[in-house]
Amino acid sequence: MNTSILPTYNRAPLAFERGEGSWLFTKNGDGYLDMGAGIAVNALGHSNSELVEALTSQANKLWHVSNLYEIPEQQRLAELMVDTTFADSVFFTNSGTESCELAVKMVRKFWHEKGQGERVEIITFDGSFHGRSSAGIAAAGSEKLTKGFGPMLPGFVHLPWSNHDAIEAAINEKTAAILIEPIQGEGGIRLLPDQCLKGLRDLCDKHDILLAVDEVQCGIGRTGRLFAHEWSGIEPDIAMVAKGIGGGFPLGAVLAKTSAASGMTAGTHGSTYGGNPLACSVGIKVLEIVNTPEFLNSVTKKSGLITQGLLGLIDKYPDIFEEIRGTGLMLGIKCKCPNLDFVQEGYEKAILTVPASDNVVRLLPALNITIEEINEALSRLEQTANSLRIAK
């Protein structure tokens, strides 16, 4: 253990020197098939040549300039996002946590400007994850996140996942918004059915409150659409974005309709690094690659191949696996063995997966993973399951 680093992570005894596509390599040259992609961050794999070119080209011109000035790369990326989404405007951050913070501020400022400052309560859901800031952990509400950190930021109402009647019963004169992940990632790859998201949109319209979706993990092509909420045909008022949009470079965003963002005027929010030229140059290239029908269709095709293979593994190893969850390339395997045992045994088979709540192992590969790599991943997952069976 490196004692000079704050021990907030229970790190695996692995260190990587370089990456290429869906592979990570140690200094000894050992290759690991990365089915986690930095927890849905490396949307186009490691060291993608087009992203490297976008980054290095910009690095040779300008790294940072304050948001006191116009930033052409930021303006271009914002235009791309507005042109292809529900949003009318964008604010750039460096992470999903920062995006959550702004979404909370935006919701509350919206009501303050309407003369209804008492409307501060945001409905959130059990199993959710919205980052590790004070607002983020208060929004999620899990004791695992909040224990020991003193009084929580008030104004969050935590409800059971996808219980329409409970949600409507909780809406009152203090309710400002509903905040939800279309697919819970940390919560165990729990997919909100399309009809439920439609129902939330209807509830928000009925009671004149805002709908905010957290697409930090499930957005940027991961489900076969640019954003997961698109499958339901609804438009949120606010969306939080990060992870895949930067392809591995720190970048996040909050997308908003004009009405929802109406309270965010000069001086109400800011970011030193948010929307810097380096990050936005990479983000532009990510969107240009991912947001095409051909690319998004390929995600759906690859999802079908992985899912078919996983179903075969469940049939063959019913003592190890219980069910498959998710959609696109945001998949989860609920295990019967401890999920951490599976992840750790995977290290021995040189495959990287990601644990989640509810004893789930996440598969979040690069969106451009090849068919050959999918077959190799399924083989290594089977080897892992077989080793755990033998060890029983």
Describe these PLM feature segments:
Residues M1-K392:
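Conserved N-terminal phosphate-binding loop of PLP-dependent enzymes in the Aspartate aminotransferase
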